[in-house]
A protein has these predicted regions:
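Iron-sulfur (Fe-S) cluster-binding modules
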Residues: 1-99, 103, 107, 113, ...
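Catalytic cores of enzyme domains
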Residues: 85, 91-213
Length: 213
């Protein structure tokens, strides 16, 4: 994405005070729902902003739990994959795929949001696989874009995702393995999702899944 005044205005609209007006999808209640839907995502994103980390969007999410000194050993990698998929569904993910880490899709740098400078991505050693999740948005609300209600559909799933990826990463670290929670911040998720078997690459440069399109 190229940063412009229009892109800045778009993202700022999610952080400014609501400006209700007449019309379906733009009332005070509609903006209240949108802002509440983004709350958990915003809390996670802002918690280390003073350190230059806008986590989940421009930096990987910081670990909240250490890697256990005692490692759970699996007889087969398939057993570990099946377990992670079950745990992902338990935490609330609609789709879960796993693939090997392809470093072609990782960003070479991240941005320090204090001065917009480039800094190291800061991923730990020992990462070998990528867990890719899918979340179903409310179709009826999505179809109301560009209303505040459309933003509520997006915000709800970003907040869900923030919680889910942190929980999965914590689970894996408690098993004795390194894991980093990530959203839109670490690499190109579209090719990762395709490699993880969640769907096919579409002409609109997104992933089309059998379940949700």
């Amino acid at each position: 994405m190229v940063r412009t005044k229009k892109t800045d205005s778009f993202f700022e609209s999610y952080r400014m005070e609501a400006a209700p007006r007449k019309g379906d999808g733009f009332t005070q209640k509609d903006f209240a729902l949108r802002n509440a839907s983004w709350l958990i995502s915003d809390i996670m994103t802002d918690r280390h902003a003073k350190k230059g980390r806008r986590e989940g969007f421009q930096a990987p999410i910081s670990n909240d739990t250490p890697v256990s000194d005692e490692k759970v050993v699996y007889k087969k990698s398939e057993d570990a994959s099946l377990e992670i998929k079950k745990v992902s569904k338990f935490f609330g993910a609609d789709l879960c795929g796993i693939t090997g880490l392809d470093k072609r899709w990782l960003y070479s740098k991240r941005v320090d949001v204090r001065d917009m400078s480039e800094v190291d991505l800061g991923l730990p050693d020992g990462l070998t696989h990528v867990i890719v999740l899918g979340h179903q948005m409310d179709k009826d609300l999505v179809q109301t874009y560009p209303s505040a209600l459309g933003g509520a559909a997006t915000g709800r799933e970003y907040s869900h995702e923030a919680s889910i990826v942190m929980q999965i990463a914590a689970y894996i670290r408690n098993l004795g393995y390194q894991a980093v929670a990530s959203m839109n911040d670490t690499g190109l998720v579209i090719p990762m999702a395709v490699q993880a078997g969640l769907g096919e690459y579409a002409r609109n440069q997104l992933v089309i899944t059998p379940e949700f399109g």
